[in-house]
């Protein structure tokens, strides 16, 4: 039937989008952590 196809497609899309957003979220966390590390090591307290 047509409905199982739509449901299956929806589930597939949901999983893919979930993984994408998860990867994006992890990527942003790593990126921000990297930036804060650069900020911390990039200047002495006197210079900040």
Curated annotation (Swiss-Prot):
Highest taxon in the source lineage: Eukaryota
Cellular-component GO terms for this entry: extracellular region
Subcellular localization(s) per the UniProt record: Secreted
Gene Ontology biological-process annotations: defense response to Gram-negative bacterium
Expressed in which tissues: Expressed by the skin glands.
Keywords: Amphibian defense peptide, Antibiotic, Antimicrobial, Disulfide bond, Secreted
Intrachain disulfide bonds: 43-48
Keyword flag rRNA-binding: no
Function of the protein: Antimicrobial activity against Gram-negative bacterium E.coli.
The family this protein is said to belong to: Belongs to the frog skin active peptide (FSAP) family. Brevinin subfamily.
Name of this chain's protein: Palustrin-3b
Organism: Lithobates palustris (Pickerel frog)
